[in-house]
Amino acid sequence: MICVGIDVSKDKHDCFILSSEGEVLADVFTIPNNAEGFTALLPTIRHCTHPADKIKVGLEATGHYSYNILGFPLDCGLPTYVINPLHTNLYRKSLSLRKTKTDRVDARTIATMLMSDVDLKSYTDTSYHNEELKSLTRYRFDKVRERAKLKQSVSRLVTILFPELEKLVPSLHIVSVYTLLSEFPGAHQIADAHLTHLKTVLSDASKGRYDREKAIEIRDAARNSIGSCMPAKSLELKHTIQLIRELDAEIAEIESEINSIMEVVHSPITTIPGLGIRMGAMILAEVGDFSNFDSADKILAYAGLSPSTYQSGQLTNCYSHMEKRGSRYLRYAIFNATKYVCIHDPTFAAYLSKKRAEGKPYNVAVSHAAKKLVRLIYAMERSGQPYKLPT
């Protein structure tokens, strides 16, 4: 067996080739991070092997720098292993007491790990889907947060330009209101609008729910409004609504891609009532391979949902707060998914009510339900069985 260790960096990659007997077949050599470098790597590997030899390629998970070099050995049909940099660091320290860390040393370390660590798992199609899901769900998370900030700006601007509007509509953040404010960004513009045009804008945007009487009500409120006439704020409001609409379209496109991958993954956890595609995809993406975790408690710790402990002498903390370490995306997905599951699933609803009856605050009770949900998800992913309501 031939082990190829690759230390990844932005502009070049250091490579080292080792046999399973520990013989150095190719000392550390460097290839540029381009097509010529990739093309030169494969003949070098083939030159060190015999037809019957198995080849293993290993590299560290270094974020976006490793994506392209990772795809090359996979496209060549070579089993490829992606290793956690922390794992590599600890392994290197176990080999020597010297504080030596260079790209050349890391390449040797990765090759040695491939030779000695039989528990490493190769990169598979499932790993690819997890990476795609992680990119998409995190991208969506950031877009949704960006949109939320813009919606706060809309609320702030309406308070300045037409504060009475909020009491006349179910929400400021609906299509009909955004259409109205895009056309008439302020009380003064609405007050001067022709009633027929105002009624048409509202009726078309609300699909007929807002009639002439609603248009009169809004115009009368605008004519008696205390809102300021500030052209700069009106322009900001129009542009902010335009940005929100663009983000809505982008988020919809992202969610479409997520749905396509989830159809391929076909995870059983989406059968849990209240656990939708979006939160389910985020949980799957952040956890990755469930077999990497010995128990559901390890996933809780990875998400930062385990209780912290502080003890010194006779002092022990009375209230254990969540550690809030690890993946904040996973923590967010689990906590929010739990809230919806507790609404739609009677078993979880009863469990949440039980914790609330014990006097626990709402968020504390939800955190207990979250632990229960993680254990359920872990069991379902390991067994592959869909969710069944307890009888």
Which residues make up each language-model segment?
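A detector of single, family-specific signature residues
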Residues: 1-391
